[in-house]
Amino acid sequence: MNFALFGYPKTGKTTLFNLLTGAHLETTAYDDGHRESSLRSCPIPDDRLDRLAGLYQEKKKIPAALDITDLHGISYGEVKNSALLGLLRKADGLVHVVRGFADESIPHPRPVNPAQDIRAMEEELALADFVSIETRLEKLEKDLKKAKSPEGEKEKGVLEKLRASVEAGRGICGADLAPAEEKTIRSFAFLSQKPLLHLINADDKDAPRLEDTAGLYCLGPTRGRPMAFCGRVESEILQLEAGEAEAFLAEFGLARTVRQRFFEAAPRLLDLIFFFTIGKEEVRAWAVKKNASALAAAGAIHTDIERGFIRAEVISCQELFGFGSLQAAKDKGAVRLEGKDYIVQDGDVIYFRFST
């Protein structure tokens, strides 16, 4: 799982990266925008995993992880030409960092206007996809003149359908593709189809109103989900002890940190759920897509388990907490046996039986 942080220059991308990952990368008002990208793998907080680990204190606790990449700034109007396009397409989700603070000491190429920047970026992402469609169609048409190809004709038909949808103002997501058509274009990794979070770096004075992000910035309809944070305030909080940090948050009217809110929102954006395993040496959380089968969950752990799948022993973590241990739950007959088509539920504790 990977989220890419990107946006126009001087918005606070690296500040946000530090807040989310605990890194200490240098931030500067005069970054030339040509530094290397940075990547950190972050544990996803989960109270349920903490409780499970509490039942098995001798075992190591291993949370699910989310990779976060900090990309350098992209100039206005240059997304379609950016060298970062490949990295954006590889990401599972996108975090567009938007400037919402005024500070003359940190130069910004345009007047600070979050609503305008969000609209502009969403249009640029759509344009980058449209350019990819046009480029591929041109090549396909040339190739099909040389030699007929059923697969090529099929791809051409789907891309023409996408182009028509974009030209009609419905965008790629409004093309109403069939599952087989979706599969045909999956390799394009269109940016307009990726989960998108707009994170606005707000002025300190706006801290008490961050929960009403859309109202605060008069955003109107957006494809991505808007959220806001106070980068300067939270950067100061990082330097404080836990007790002092809570008091500082309260002083600015902040109920939760951006890290807490992001790690709550990110799995939902990616349509993920979590299940848990209790092994000989570890208690571990795993992420899978919602509606994943037991067989797919087995594959998330190891292909050998998927290949040799026999049965899954399943109990919800909430039920398990009531029994106090997995063995106690088994003794009471509360652990179910499920087959490979069982749909994994968020919070399931699963033991996979498999042949080697």
Question: Where are these predicted regions, by residue range?
Answer:
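Amphipathic alpha-helical transducer elements in NTP-driven molecular machines
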Residues: 46-49, 65, 81, 85-92, ...
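Short, charged beta->alpha transition segments
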Residues: 84, 123, 183-186
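Conserved G1/Walker A P-loop phosphate-binding module
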Residues: 1-103, 140
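C-terminal-of-GTPase-core extension/linker across diverse P-loop GTPases
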Residues: 1-7, 11-17, 21, 139-345, ...
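Conserved Switch II/interswitch segment of TRAFAC-class P-loop GTPases
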Residues: 42-43, 71-78, 89-151, 165-177, ...
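A generic fold-level signal
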Residues: 34-36, 61-63, 113, 191-192, ...
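Glycine-rich, phosphate-binding/catalytic loops in enzymes
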Residues: 85-86, 111-114, 214-216
